[in-house]
Amino acid sequence: MTIRGLVGEAPTKNQEMLNWIEEAVELFQPESVVFCDGSEEEWNELAEQLVEHGTLIKLDEEAQPNSFLARSNPSDVARVESRTFICSKTEEDAGPTNNWMDPEQMRAEMREHFSGSMKGRRMYIVPFCMGPITDPSPKLGIEITDSPYVVMSMRIMTRMGKEALDKIGENGEFVKGLHSVGAPLEPGQEDSTWPCNDTKYITHFPEDREIWSYGSGYGGNAILAKKCYALRIASAMARDEGWMAEHMLILKLISPEDKAYYICAAFPSACGKTNLAMIQPTIPGWRAEVVGDDIAWLHFGEDGRLYAVNPENGFFGVAPGTNYASNPMAMKSMEPGNTLYTNVALTDDNNVWWESKEGEPQHLIDWLGNEWTPDSGNKAAHPNSRYCVPIEQCPVAAPEFNDPKGVPVSAILFGGRRADTVPLVTQARDWNHATFIGATLASGQTAAAAEAAVGSLRHDPMAMLPFIGYNAGDYLQHWIDMGNKGGDKMPEVFLVNWFRRGEDGRFLWPGFGENSRVLKWIIDRIEGRVEADETVVGYTARYEDIYTDGLKETEEDIREALSVNPADWERDLADNEEWLKFLGPKVPSEVWDEFQGLKDRVEAAK
């Protein structure tokens, strides 16, 4: 079958795919069409083209081999939650946490925007696999895009190209993604270095397993394998198929006895998730490796335990705040190069810099392309600037990240950024209690999403608020159901808070690599080696059971970090009740029972 604009024959005989591509060509009207094969030649060709075009700046080959800096349009710098839609067949299925529009109405509206939106541009057909390509029943996808920057990002973030296309084969299932930056070119019209459109839509059709995105070239809005597929669409698939798609890191912790434990952790953005994923333990004999830094797909193994797979192939991390002290392994991952940077600053010797990175440059070109000095009064890198780098370059990448069976999960952590109330570490009483803890997880507002007031407390159930692809009440029910199915083989669940402050406003706990002391306590609990204090919020660690050798912090500070004040929790009760009511009538009775249990314990502790 010939496709208009494609040179030669299509490299697939999958009729459903070919028909879909033909419809897309008809709709978008691109100048040419190309199937991406994921090869190095293709990467080099795209990079060369984008450097020539001014979209990418090639970095110093010695310092940053095969690496590039992109500067986006200043209006296109983060996920736009207000323009993100879950277009399930009924509004009830989208629930109160998602924007909803009738799917037929949305398709009609988007077709108008898509119509001719690739004029003067090349259409790229990007086949990709979520998780290891060796998986006997892999989750596959195809993104159709007009952004070569997206193609390069997808090559890092997924197993992309010919192998994935071959996996789909003649009749394999795949998630369909359509993406256009929404900037058609008339003959002779000069192109922008970062084409995008003021009108933006990131829409999901969960029942049809489709994603349509328009107007943005940035990160999670455009790299559809990331949050769109790996969380929003996958969470709907997981509910239907009996697994879980979660916004969690996957960490491998190795004890002095050489026993490996796998820990998943869900933190809202800017709460130290990537730092924990690549933690370097400070306590003797303990080691850690990373399986994933952002997303975990959890399923039951043959032995009835919960196993985690990282569906991604790269890290897409926030650059500012990353340095050799806070996250040495992320920095070392970038040392071999092959990295795509977005909206960081450029040094005079063609290298990259961002706030809190080592060195004090006296002159830079900032993320907007302007001259910058320390007196400029603005940040040189955008607060949500990014590095995109292959996982395999991380010196502590666990080999299991390529194992389609996944890794057995010993513990799940929830954590937010709370200055008060929440102790350093507490164990949930059981799975239903854990679901309640996750459902009411809250954090101080950060600037990693494009909207919302910084500093306010934001509820973020399981750190999934922007990513649940269906009704949040049904999502909590799915957690309860998975717990019922897994029984006593479910992982233990813990609530952590690295960010507790004293009355004078200083952090009580040092965080970063020292968090390994908390991880050790968690393992000690799993192995039955330590007791805990039963508090209103769960089983809280006792000071004497935390390994404190070599810690600079005082005993007084650590005791305060571990403390549980029922009066603080009483203050949280009204907030939690309001939140659960907002989530609507589908919130499981088990979660309300846990809320009542907390209320009763707080009352009894007065």
UniProtKB/Swiss-Prot annotation:
GO terms for biological process: cellular response to glucose stimulus; gluconeogenesis; glycerol biosynthetic process from pyruvate; oxaloacetate metabolic process; propionate catabolic process; response to lipid; response to starvation. Substrate binds at R79, Y218, G219, G220, S269, N384, S385, R386. GTP binds at A270, C271, G272, K273, T274, N275, R386, R417, F512, G513, E514, N515. One of its GO terms (cellular component) is cytosol. Keywords: Cytoplasm, Decarboxylase, Gluconeogenesis, GTP-binding, Lyase, Manganese, Metal-binding, Nucleotide-binding. Pathway: Carbohydrate biosynthesis; gluconeogenesis. The active site is at C271. Its main location: cytoplasm. InterPro entries: PEP_carboxykin_GTP_CS, PEP_carboxykinase_C, PEP_carboxykinase_GTP, PEP_carboxykinase_GTP_C, PEP_carboxykinase_GTP_N, PEP_carboxykinase_N. Binds 1 Mn(2+) ion per subunit. Mn(2+) binds at K227, H247, D294. Its EC number is 4.1.1.32. Its cofactor is Mn(2+). GO terms for molecular function: GTP binding; manganese ion binding; phosphoenolpyruvate carboxykinase (GTP) activity. Catalyzes the conversion of oxaloacetate (OAA) to phosphoenolpyruvate (PEP), the rate-limiting step in the metabolic pathway that produces glucose from lactate and other precursors derived from the citric acid cycle. Belongs to the phosphoenolpyruvate carboxykinase [GTP] family. This is Phosphoenolpyruvate carboxykinase [GTP]. It comes from Corynebacterium jeikeium (strain K411). The gene is pckG.
